[in-house]
């Protein structure tokens, strides 16, 4: 985890958003979860922190597969 407190906060916010995405997905609200996951990917990319970017991309890819969006996944 980075030392910079602002970056740590941004990463924490992305992680929290991804937890919400997972909860939404578990309720079967896949399209809604995909929208939130896409926003999380954008937020993760803004941090520049590779592990959180990878986590967000993986979550979004899983949702795209679940919604049969194979080209996007």
Regions found by a protein language model. Name each.
Residues 33, 39-40, 73:
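Tetratricopeptide repeat
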Residues 13-15, 55-57:
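Residue register of alpha-helical TPR repeats
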Residues 38-49:
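Amphipathic alpha-helical segments of tetratricopeptide repeats
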Residues 30, 50, 70-71:
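TPR-repeat structural position
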Residues 8-9, 48:
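Structural signature of alpha-solenoid helical repeat scaffolds
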